[in-house]
Amino acid sequence: MTRRAGLYDPASKALGVAMLDFDGDGRMDLFVANDTQPNRLYRNKGDGTFADAAVAAGVAFSEAGVARAGMGVDAADYDDSGRPSLVIGNFSNEMMALYHNEGTGLFIDEAPRSAIGRASLLTLTFGCFFFDYDLDGRLDIFAANGHVADDIDRVQSRVTYAQRPHLFHNLGRNTFEEATPQAGAALQTKLVGRGAAYADIDNDGDLDVLVTANNAPARLFRNDGGNRNNAIRIRTIGTRSNRDGIGARVEVSLRGAPRRWQIVKTGSSYGSQSELTPTFGLGAETKVEGMLVKWPSGQVDTIGPLEANQIVTVREGAGVAGATPLRSAPGARP
């Protein structure tokens, strides 16, 4: 089946996979992050087969034309363009990649000109993902770091085996800043990080982070204070589509803001699975004007308005099947 689908690639070393509709044709494509081999971007042709478009799209190599050591990857619309972009974890001395989807079939790596590139030049990133840690409505980036050689500092004095994670705060207008120093003492601990995933473990609306590490226990970082802004979380139940609604596109409309969307997805990051429930940060907004859920079956459910600070269950073809309030924290917006 893999060979017939055009995905058979025994020469590559795949470590991270993300699904995205990069060309806006309504079909889910596949991105594969490869270690020391060109990345692959498999365009879904709609007939059960795929064609590699990575070179033409500008995501196969670095800007210098070199194949990097791709590890983890995630896809999301971090700039409200309506198009999914890519974040990729790479080897030390390569920096992370932030491929912005230009909407023309081409991606441009924004990392070398941003705080992301400067901060990640010496780190080796495995797990990475987009998520809105402060619920301001803009997707931020988390990266779990750690080298593969425990004596790397002998040959590269500025590179260490255990490394701190990165938390990049999205300031809007394609600008990020590293927020790790302000995120609390827990994120200052150096780890040989590998997998990374997120979930709201305490039902308070903000997203917590789990990181696995070599030769050490997993670390669960609870997000305290991220819910000072409002949020809405959407749980999907498929009927004609798959049970969990994987592949559904959830779009929310807010007063005076661009429509925001997320995909109910599996995979992404590195060796990890985050929760399926999309979480939308609403900032100061207290309700969602409207919501669309576009299911893999083709069914479209129109819902709303909805009050903020709840987890809403949507059943395919039936609309809202239930809603549960989120547990608010001291300092949360009323």
Residue spans for each PLM region:
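A short loop-to-beta-strand structural motif that recurs across blades of beta-propeller domains
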Residues: 40-42, 97-99, 164-167, 219
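Short loop/turn motifs that recur once per blade in beta-propeller domains
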Residues: 2-10, 51-67, 108-124, 158-159, ...
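Hydrophobic beta-strand segments that make up the repeating blades of beta-propeller
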Residues: 25, 29-34, 85-90, 141-144, ...
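Short loop/turn segments that connect beta-strands within beta-propeller blades
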Residues: 45-48, 102-105, 171-173, 224-226
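Short, conserved, GDST-rich strand-edge loop motifs in beta-rich repeat architectures
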Residues: 143-161
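Beta-rich catalytic cores
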Residues: 13-15, 37, 69, 94, ...
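Gly/Ser/Thr/Pro-enriched helix-cap/hinge segments flanking short amphipathic alpha-helices
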Residues: 116-118, 157-334
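Beta-propeller blade termini
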Residues: 14-24, 28, 43, 70-79, ...
